Curated annotation (Swiss-Prot):
Primary location: plastid
Keywords: Chloroplast, Oxidoreductase, Plastid, Thylakoid
Highest classification ranks of the organism: Eukaryota, Viridiplantae, Streptophyta, Embryophyta, Tracheophyta
Keyword Ligase applies: no
Domain of life: Eukaryota
Protein name per its UniProtKB record: Thylakoid lumenal 29 kDa protein, chloroplastic
Similarity section: Belongs to the peroxidase family.
Length: 30
């Protein structure tokens, strides 16, 4: 169970990085 939680957390972090990346690309002023 611990391994699954760790994997979900890493996937969640990568999703956030992807979202932030697209947001920054759409708003270069930031």
């Amino acid at each position: 169970a611990d391994l699954i939680q760790r994997r979900q957390r890493s996937e969640f972090q990568s999703d956030i990085k992807g979202i932030l990346y697209t947001v920054i690309k759409k708003n270069p002023d930031l």
